[in-house]
């Protein structure tokens, strides 16, 4: 009897012990994916940024930890993909413009975990190319892109996040991105670097100024402030930023052709005879009988930049724009985009390296050589010159030198950093505004998205 009772008690105890364990194991299995889901939301965030530039469209996918430190995606610090031409090339076919982004959208969805896509913000910033389209062409393209994102993507986006990026936004994002990568954000403004971003349609200058300079800042003629107050990495900055529309590298060519009163242009290489198309307008490209001249090209470029335009304030750059007053925030300068690209084609920059120290005078010296060379011989001297840039090499080099020296007031022998990428930890990160946009977007939207989704 005792043995039977013992056996019965043993069975009851076994059932009693096993039952909670089985229930507990079911609860654990149910919580594991939930816990993983919550942890991933708390510890990492993604942002998808489309850069719809004048020469092409690019997508950047960034991954951040909870402190907005960049985390790798695969073997790289970001996912990047590009396509050509830019959206503005589809001015008469908005749907084709939107469809040109499909490969980029597919690529982004391939790297962001599916469970995070609904709370991953997506923003498209169109820059100078779309700004210059006439009528409602730009808005029709943007609406087609909004429809694409809404119908074919699971990313979190809003109509106002697919828009033409204001030039000052572009400049401030670039400044934030480069200073973030250099580890300058959070430090005194004197430790930050100025940025000059020479795009295709516009050029942006941005740098931090003192409180004293901020107090004296004049009002821009268009009503927009010259200075933005930014709070980044627990530090307040007075950020001078201005975007010069129509003064990017490609738009600058058009301005120089407009400034020429003759059919021939002293900036065109000898042997050139054709047309340059920009913004829906064709410009005659023909060198004078004596060939191009760097001196006459420089005079024409100064005229195109409106260097001598009336300045109603204390100090101006060009075209009557306030220069920000200078100061320690402009002591160091990082110049990007076409400054690197053109510099690489004439040997100022070695493309084996993500950046290089250079001086404005080097662009002038290269121009002196290019301007006295026949279009058929330019490759023998500058073999890395892209074929599409050959007719304009003299013009481009003179333009960049004049922009830096006469426009922004740099000493011809001042050493600046010309960059394509920035070394960040063990990675190279592209010097572009999308990173600054991503930092701003993630920090301002992540909590809102979570609350709305819960």
Swiss-Prot record:
The active site is at 170 (proton acceptor). GO terms for cellular component: membrane. Glycans are attached at residues 151, 262. InterPro entries: GDA1_CD39_NTPase. The keyword Zinc does not apply. The N-terminus is blocked. Belongs to the GDA1/CD39 NTPase family. This is Apyrase. Its EC number is 3.6.1.5. GO terms for molecular function: apyrase activity; ATP binding; nucleoside diphosphate phosphatase activity. Keywords: ATP-binding, Calcium, Glycoprotein, Hydrolase, Membrane, Nucleotide-binding, Signal-anchor, Transmembrane, Transmembrane helix. Catalyzes the hydrolysis of phosphoanhydride bonds of nucleoside tri- and di-phosphates. GO terms for biological process: nucleoside diphosphate catabolic process. Residues 1-7 are cytoplasmic. It holds the Pfam family GDA1_CD39. The chain crosses the membrane at residues 8-28. Its cofactor is Ca(2+). Gene3D superfamilies: 3.30.420.40, Exopolyphosphatase. Domain 2. It is an enzyme of class 3 (hydrolase). ATP binds at residues 48-58, 194-204. It is found in: Membrane. The keyword rRNA-binding does not apply. PANTHER family: ADENOSINE/GUANOSINE DIPHOSPHATASE, APYRASE.
């Amino acid at each position: 009897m005792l043995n039977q009772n013992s056996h019965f008690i043993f069975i009851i105890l076994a059932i009693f012990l096993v039952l909670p364990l089985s229930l507990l194991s079911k609860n654990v299995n149910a919580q594991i994916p939930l816990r993983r889901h919550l942890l991933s939301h708390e510890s990492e965030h993604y942002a998808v940024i489309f850069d719809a530039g004048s020469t092409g469209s690019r997508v950047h996918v960034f991954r951040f930890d909870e402190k907005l430190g960049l985390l790798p995606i695969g073997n790289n610090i970001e996912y990047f993909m590009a396509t050509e031409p830019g959206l503005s090339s589809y001015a008469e076919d908005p749907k084709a413009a939107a469809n040109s982004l499909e490969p980029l959208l597919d690529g982004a969805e391939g790297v962001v975990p599916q469970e995070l896509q609904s709370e991953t913000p997506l923003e498209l910033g169109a820059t100078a190319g779309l700004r210059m389209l006439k009528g409602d062409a730009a808005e029709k393209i943007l609406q087609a892109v909004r429809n694409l994102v809404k119908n074919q993507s699971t990313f979190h986006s809003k109509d106002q996040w697919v828009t033409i990026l204001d030039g000052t936004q572009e400049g401030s994002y670039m400044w934030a991105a480069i200073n973030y990568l250099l580890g300058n954000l959070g430090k005194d403004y004197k430790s930050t670097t100025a940025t000059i971003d020479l795009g295709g349609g516009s050029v942006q200058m941005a740098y931090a100024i003192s409180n004293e300079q901020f107090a004296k800042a004049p009002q821009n003629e268009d009503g927009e402030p010259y200075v933005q107050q930014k709070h980044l990495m627990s530090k307040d900055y007075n950020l001078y930023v201005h975007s010069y529309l129509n003064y990017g590298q490609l738009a600058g060519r058009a301005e120089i052709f407009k400034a020429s009163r003759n059919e021939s242009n002293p900036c065109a290489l000898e042997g050139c005879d054709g047309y340059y198309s920009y913004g829906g307008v064709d410009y005659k490209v023909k060198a004078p009988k004596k060939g191009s001249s760097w001196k006459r090209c420089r005079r024409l470029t100064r005229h195109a930049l409106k260097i001598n335009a009336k300045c109603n304030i204390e100090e101006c750059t060009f075209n009557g724009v306030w220069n920000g007053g200078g100061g320690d925030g402009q002591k160091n300068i990082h110049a990007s985009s076409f400054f690197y690209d053109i510099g690489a084609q004439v040997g100022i920059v070695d493309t084996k390296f993500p950046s290089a120290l250079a001086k404005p005078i080097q662009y002038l010296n290269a121009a002196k050589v290019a301007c006295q060379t026949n279009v058929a011989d330019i490759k023998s001297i500058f073999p890395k010159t892209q074929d599409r840039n050959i007719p304009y090499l003299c013009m481009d080099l003179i333009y960049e030198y004049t922009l830096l020296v006469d426009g922004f007031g740099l000493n011809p022998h001042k050493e600046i950093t010309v960059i394509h990428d920035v070394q960040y930890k063990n990675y190279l990160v592209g010097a572009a505004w999308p990173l600054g946009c991503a930092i701003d977007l993630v920090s301002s939207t992540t909590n809102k998205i979570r609350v709305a989704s819960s």
